[in-house]
Amino acid sequence: MVIFKKFILKISSLRFAILLIIFIAISSGVGTFIPQGNDQQEYIDFYNETPILGFINGSQVIRLQLDHIYTSNWFLFSLILLCISLAACSFRRQIPSLKAALKWTDYKDEKKFYKLELITNYEIIQDADHILKADSLLRKKGWNISKFENRLSARKGLEGKLGPIIVHIGLIILLIGSAYGNFSSQSKEQYLRLGESLDLINESTNSRVKIKLKNFFIERESDGKPKQFISNLEFFSKQQNLNEIKTTQVNQPIRFKGLTIYQADWSVSNIVMEIDSVLYQLQLKPIPEIGDQIWGLLIELGRENKKNYLLTIDNENGPLKVSNIEDFSENFVYLNNNPIEINSSKLSLKKIIPSSGLIIKNDPSIPFIYLSFTLIIVGTILSLIPTNQIWILFNENTNKLFIGGLSNRNLLGFKKEFLKLSDEIKNN
């Protein structure tokens, strides 16, 4: 029991929580540096050649679970430990502080007033019930009052004591939601060509929705670099009597019935070419060896003496580069332009078909994340509210009225309010 109390005392300290948060933040940063969820052999091949920090090879990456940090045993343990730390801090510090604040403190002796941060007193000349008048004045200004025969206690801003507790609850929900999302979320990357559709099936409700790419276009900078990718998607379901078009672009996902659809990438997936009066739809593939965002394929051209040519394209408007892989000569074919002759074959580019790269993610932890951030924001705002207290005591022997005040924050602002209230009570 003693060991358990020492353990709770240790983990409920602010220093321990801060160190744990720093550890989790650094671990999350490492997770963005090291690709997550790839095949283990990829880590072994890559990090054996280029070890992390010069000494952590591929086998050690896997052994330390750095290939799946967010679902690793040690990362989840640190999240659980932080939840326990926050809960322990709430029960050891915040809740007792709230309970203490809910209890009225009664100052019967004027000597106690001199221990307060703010104090004033003055002699009563006229015969009047100043306690009753002070009670009425403070109630009108929104103070809560506990009144006795010759004294009263007043307080305002008690909701500020709830702020830290609400923040801790929000953080705990955030940690639990994040861990839940790491295990339960599903993600799929899908490229859709214009007019191509995809079925989305919700197994829990046995509902099916078809999405179809109606339009896709790229906004470019003045120098031709991509600025924004935009997809218009049609959502259709006879079962749900649904037919509507939604738009997604980078950093503006579509949220639909628990799914989130992100605009992630694009590609040139197909081209339609006429070669010697015959139409061909050719599928292109990325060629990272040549450069980023370059797609192409290898074909044979020529009626008798056939030669291999590499077709490449780097944007949705063309032109198409035709390269002879033997002598490296190049020709360009422009969209809907006159055909050109290469090795006795006539080529013309009829259509360029881009694809929209979408990431479709099902993350049931999203409601927990939104709830947690709402609680954290509300709790933070409440924490900014100062808790102010005022005590008033009338000494019948000396015929003096004592007024004292205390505030847990913004003492300078409360001092101005305190002096103003004191003058109003004196002149009331």
From Swiss-Prot:
GO terms for cellular component: plasma membrane-derived thylakoid membrane
Protein's job: Required during biogenesis of c-type cytochromes (cytochrome c6 and cytochrome f) at the step of heme attachment.
Keyword annotations from UniProtKB, A to Z: Cytochrome c-type biogenesis, Membrane, Thylakoid, Transmembrane, Transmembrane helix
Gene assigned in the entry: ccsB
Subunit relationships: May interact with CcsA.
Family of this protein: Belongs to the Ccs1/CcsB family.
Localization annotation: Cellular thylakoid membrane
InterPro entries: Cyt_c_bgen_Ccs1/CcsB/ResB, ResB-like_domain
Pfam families given in the database record: ResB
Transmembrane residue ranges: 14-34, 72-92, 162-182
Gene Ontology BP annotations: cytochrome complex assembly
Membrane topology: Multi-pass membrane protein
Protein's name according to its UniProt entry: Cytochrome c biogenesis protein CcsB
